[in-house]
Amino acid sequence: MFEKGSTAVLSTSRLPFIVAVKNAGLYSFEKGEWLLQYPLSHSIYKLVGISPYIFGIGDNGLIVRYNPYNNKWTHTFFPTPQRLWDITGNESGIIITHVGSKLYISYNFGSNWSVIHPFKELSIKPFIRSLFLYKEHLYIGTQINRESGGLWSFSLESGELTLVKKESNSMISSIYIDCEDCMFIAKGNARSKEGSIEMKSLRGSRWRTFEQTISEKAFLDVFNVGKNLYTTTSKDEYGYSRIYEINKQRHILLPIETIEGHGFRGAGCKDELFISSPIESKWIDRSYEMTKLVH
């Protein structure tokens, strides 16, 4: 049933992993045991826990929500044929996702939505690829756009748009900010093979690129497990991608595992990691250095 792999994964306090199995729905996964939570024929590309809710987004404007108060999953669609890549929010009820170059924002955990055009003053508007809400600032990573591509900061209070990092030839596929106010971005360009992980302090302006021993076309996801950070990549010419541990102190990427296909998303729970690829899913138990394919 799982030979097609998965496209997104989330670790929660209630379940070690919730997995979006490609074109099949949402499953819980615990120690090798699968249980269907919500059947769905559309693929989901990001799952996020925004306490106390869970949200997912995917193909054709899909948005999924789990409501813990009635223990139910529901889904609907934004009016677009586009794939949604990212969703972010906070515990006060702000939820933000994207369609093309515009934002959909809710102030009540997805019950009602309105549209914001952060790039309305730009003559060439980039498509959005990644989002991260930090306090009142929304950080926006774009798809490749020579004129307007890069990392942007949008103030939810004033509506001011600020270019944080210009990128003419790379997409920014993932953004993460840790508890020490350090920002990490995952970059990629399949044509030029110029993927990288970069970091800077929110209080500074200098970007540092992490050293890597293997050239990667693109890094796709950055996720944390406790105090540890990890990243996934696109597949190489042999059809395999890698999972790296991000060593913040030494500014290096440490390869720890491979997976067939693009490593779309990753998540972790204690010593366990789960990596989602559309070809296969991989469960890694680092306490015993044990790896299992769970496709």
PLM regions and their residue ranges:
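A short beta-strand motif characteristic of beta-propeller blades
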Residues: M1, E33-Y38, K72-F77, W113-E121, ...
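An edge-strand/N-cap motif at the start of beta-rich repeat modules
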Residues: M1-Y38
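Repeated scaffold domains used in trafficking and secretory/extracellular systems
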Residues: E3-R14, H42-I50, P81-E91, I124-F132, ...
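Entry beta-strands of beta-propeller and related beta-repeat scaffolds
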Residues: L15-V19, Y53-G56, G93-I96, H137-I140, ...
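Residue-level signature of beta-propeller blades and closely related beta-rich strand-turn architectures
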Residues: N23, N60, G100, I144-N145, ...
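Conserved Ser/Thr-centered positions that define the repeating blades of beta-propeller domains
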Residues: S28-F29, R65-N67, S106-Y107, S153-F154, ...
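Solenoidal tandem-repeat scaffolds enriched in leucines and small polar residues
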Residues: F109, W113-D178, F184-E194
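Blade-level signature of beta-propeller repeat domains, shared across WD40, Kelch, NHL, RCC1
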Residues: G261-H295
